[in-house]
Regions:
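Hydrophobic helix-and-loop "lid/oligomerization" segment in the mid-to-C-terminal part
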Residues: 1-80, 85-113
Length: 113
């Protein structure tokens, strides 16, 4: 479902976004760990060098970023999403955040990258 219906591709930015609301997680009875590794899937698409998985629970919006090459996702996570990590594998979270607002913010960041 998430790869089929929720995958957004941004070819000019060499990026992809997958998002999952808390309602979708409940609808499919997803448990912690069920989406592990999902953020890596778009990197197998030709021309995609950055992938973001955005998920929501009752308390926060969580972002997982993966990239290849010189696309430094740790800088984005530390600057915008209270996170950090490695150059090609980073994450962040926004407590009390709205997933739609965060999704729009990620789109804007990627379009300006």
């Amino acid at each position: 479902y998430l790869l089929h219906k929720k995958l957004e591709l941004y070819p000019k930015q060499h990026a992809a976004i997958i998002s999952m609301t808390k309602e979708e997680a409940e609808r499919f009875n997803l448990q912690r760990g069920d989406t592990e590794g999902l953020v890596n899937e778009p990197l197998s698409i030709a021309g995609i060098s950055c992938s973001v998985f955005i998920s929501e629970d009752k308390e926060k919006v969580k972002l997982s970023w993966r990239s290849r090459g010189d696309f430094a996702v740790n800088e984005i996570c530390s600057k915008y999403f209270n996170g950090g990590g490695h150059k090609n594998a980073s994450g962040g979270e926004v407590f009390g955040g709205n997933i739609n607002e965060i999704l729009e913010q990620v789109r804007t960041i990627l379009k300006n990258k």
